[in-house]
């Protein structure tokens, strides 16, 4: 097949899928039919409207589905605080780290095909990541000052380590280890003007923050995993998402950028952080990026992400389309930290293969069920799945900064208090 014909065929296939998918939504019913009290759900609306009136949140979309049916799907505030357009249900949001579950699912699809094993050393696919060093901080007894010693990694980083963030990779802007932080700055590991392949070359030059498989450390593990998906599949990460996840699930507004016909639907944040007063800088998403970051670069809508979450709740299947086997989803959504759980920052939760997983009925700071799982994005988005309650919830907002952490337990409590059965 010649290249022009291939391009036309690919374009036709995309248009066909998009046309078919445009009408695909989860069934919408009255709150009571989904097991919710409409009166109690009104508390959620009052609360978010109050947040908007206080100018703490520019706008939001909330979608709550139970037993495969939407019982609550409402919008609040403005699409862009600089304008007057109300928030639409099909608003597009920068989901930041809610890209990570897509990358985790992509990885497990390759595991199911026998192309990856969780015990595989990452260096099998990315040779630059062999023989890494670890930056160990110690106190100099003579001076009392903190000094850093570089020591060899005692074990290989595995695919499982990337999925559960026990690799030793971190985020340079948040790590306390000074030597690691300086190395990330020197080699521009946290930059966005690179490719997925260039990330590996850069991060290979920086030391790990701890020995692999000794602690949870949230960071670039999923970005590295995105490059593994590319190498194993022979596709860019964005193309893999499109062909293997978005098209089958009819997620028509998800990807690594907002196409030319959709920027008017892109939600925006306040220009200043509502807590710190600092300028807010959001990811540029109106043009195709060179860096399709598996851990942070995605955009999506409430409905698109709900379809993805509903697939997970369905243990790998949605509308008859199966992406993963049921045992694989169960395996992903159970705790994989074990004795390392005390290094995970969320009380009452462990971490699976891409998700925080509730392991205790108490301890946590918000309502939920043992076995529920979730993740969030730095821009203010949040979702969770509760298999016990057959519940999928998405909060889509652009509220970066400290305040985003306030809305996560708030929305959980407001949803759970409205359950009738």
Role assignments for model-derived ranges:
Residues 8-18:
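Bacterial N-terminal signal peptides
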Residues 1-4:
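Positively charged n-region of N-terminal signal peptides that target proteins for export
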Residues 61-64, 71-73, 94, 161-164, ...:
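Structural recognition of the beta-strand scaffold that forms the well-ordered cores
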Residues 25-95, 115-117, 131-139, 409, ...:
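Short, conserved catalytic-motif segment at the N-terminal edge
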Residues 374-421:
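Structured C-terminal helix/loop/strand segments within mature extracytoplasmic catalytic/sensor domains
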């Amino acid at each position: 097949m010649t290249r022009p014909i291939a391009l036309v065929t690919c374009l036709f296939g995309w248009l066909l899928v998009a046309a078919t998918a445009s009408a695909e939504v989860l069934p919408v019913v009255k709150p009571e039919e989904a097991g919710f009290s409409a009166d109690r759900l009104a508390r959620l609306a009052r609360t978010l409207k109050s947040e908007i009136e206080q100018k703490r949140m520019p706008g939001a979309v909330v979608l709550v589905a139970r037993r495969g049916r939407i019982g609550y799907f409402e919008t609040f505030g403005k699409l862009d605080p600089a304008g007057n357009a109300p928030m639409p249900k099909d608003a597009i949001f920068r989901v930041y780290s809610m890209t990570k579950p897509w990358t985790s699912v992509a990885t497990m699809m390759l595991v199911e095909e026998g192309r990856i094993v969780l015990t595989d050393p990452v260096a099998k696919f990315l040779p630059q990541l062999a023989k890494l060093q670890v930056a160990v901080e110690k106190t100099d007894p003579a001076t009392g000052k903190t000094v850093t010693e570089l020591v060899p990694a005692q074990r290989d980083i595995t695919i499982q380590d990337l999925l559960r963030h026990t690799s030793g990779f971190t985020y340079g802007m948040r790590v306390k280890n000074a030597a690691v932080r300086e190395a990330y700055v020197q080699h521009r590991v946290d930059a966005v003007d690179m490719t997925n392949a260039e990330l590996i070359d850069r991060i290979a030059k920086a030391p790990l923050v701890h020995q692999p498989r000794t602690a949870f450390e949230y960071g670039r593990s999923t970005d590295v995993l995105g490059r593994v998906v590319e190498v194993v599949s022979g596709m860019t990460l964005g193309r893999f998402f499109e062909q293997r996840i978005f098209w089958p699930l009819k997620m028509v507004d998800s990807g690594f950028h907002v196409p030319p016909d959709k920027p008017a639907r892109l939600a925006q944040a306040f220009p200043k952080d509502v807590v710190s007063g600092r300028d807010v800088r959001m990811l540029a998403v109106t043009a195709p990026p060179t860096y399709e970051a598996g851990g942070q670069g995605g955009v999506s809508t409430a409905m698109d992400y709900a379809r993805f979450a509903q697939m997970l709740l369905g243990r790998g299947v949605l509308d008859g389309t199966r992406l993963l086997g049921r045992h694989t989803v169960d395996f992903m959504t159970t705790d994989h930290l074990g004795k390392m759980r005390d290094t995970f920052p969320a009380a009452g939760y462990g971490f699976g293969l891409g998700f925080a997983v509730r392991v205790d009925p108490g301890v946590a700071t918000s309502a939920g069920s043992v076995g529920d799982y979730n993740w969030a994005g730095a821009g203010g988005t949040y979702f969770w799945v509760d298999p016990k309650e057959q519940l999928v919830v998405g909060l889509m907002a652009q509220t970066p900064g400290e305040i985003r952490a306030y809305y996560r337990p708030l929305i959980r409590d407001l949803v759970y208090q409205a359950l009738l059965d």
